[in-house]
A protein has these predicted regions:
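Acidic, polar-rich low-complexity tracts and alpha-helical solenoid repeat scaffolds
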Residues: 1-243
């Protein structure tokens, strides 16, 4: 590749990155795809990764899967290899191909040098797939594995899902204990903490503890910075007051 072509690829790549980081996904995608015309470019695999990720963000799971599978065959380093696998798993999950999630995750488990955070992403996808396939026992085991591996966002979500399972099974004390633990151990993940307090309020309502439910919701409304969580809390609070 001559220097002029290399410079053009470099300029295009960083222009695409600028659009990507500014959330101008359509413009970024057009430029990344131009960079895919040259497999010899050092920006080829990076652009594949971005295109696949953009389609995933746009919920175009079939196209995202296509590009992650291309990345799987053209990765330049271990990070891209692992990201291709997690991307493939994510798309299989959203496409409701739960058996494929289990099959692919068994392949990933054989790869070395996977960070705890990435292992937790994989564990969470497996757990959610088990739930969708109505294998609750396997799902609970995998959720607990996720929670115990490392205190990251996947573990926070796993804690919330586990509490939901306990609640639907009528194990309200276990559900509350799980949610209190979530709020204590994962307090930096505001979305999951907010959802946790919403579920705590619902559990209190189901126990006819309306005073505690109201106090929980009022505290959440006063403290959350997430408007969607605040709106949901207000709706539940209004329902209590209308009774």
């Amino acid at each position: 590749m001559n220097e002029e072509v290399f410079n053009r690829h470099e300029i295009n790549y960083y222009l695409a990155e600028s659009h990507y980081k500014s959330n101008n996904m359509e413009k970024a995608n057009i430029i990344y795809k131009k960079l895919l015309d040259s497999m010899n470019s050092k920006y080829f695999s990076r652009s594949l990764n971005r295109v696949a990720n953009i389609y995933l963000k746009q919920q175009d799971y079939n196209n995202s899967l296509i590009y992650y599978k291309k990345l799987e065959k053209n990765f330049k380093n271990n990070r891209e290899k692992i990201e291709s696998f997690i991307g493939i798993l994510s798309n299989y999950f959203y496409l409701k191909k739960y058996d494929s999630v289990q099959l692919y995750s068994s392949r990933i488990s054989q790869i070395e040098n996977i960070s705890f955070n990435n292992r937790n992403k994989i564990n969470l996808l497996k757990a959610k797939s088990y739930l969708q396939n109505e294998n609750k026992t396997a799902a609970i085991d995998m959720l607990i594995n996720t929670i115990n591996l490392v205190q990251d966002e996947s573990a926070a979500e796993a804690s919330y899902i586990l509490a939901e399972i306990f609640f639907t099974e009528g194990k309200k004390t276990q559900a509350l204990e799980t949610l209190y633990s979530l709020n204590e151990n994962f307090n930096t993940y505001e979305n999951w903490v907010g959802n946790s307090y919403l579920l705590i309020a619902k559990i209190f309502i189901s126990m006819d503890e309306k005073f505690q439910a109201k106090a929980t919701l009022e505290s959440l409304i006063d403290n959350t910075k997430i408007e969607e969580i605040k709106d949901l809390a207000l709706n539940i609070l209004n329902e209590i007051e209308d009774d």
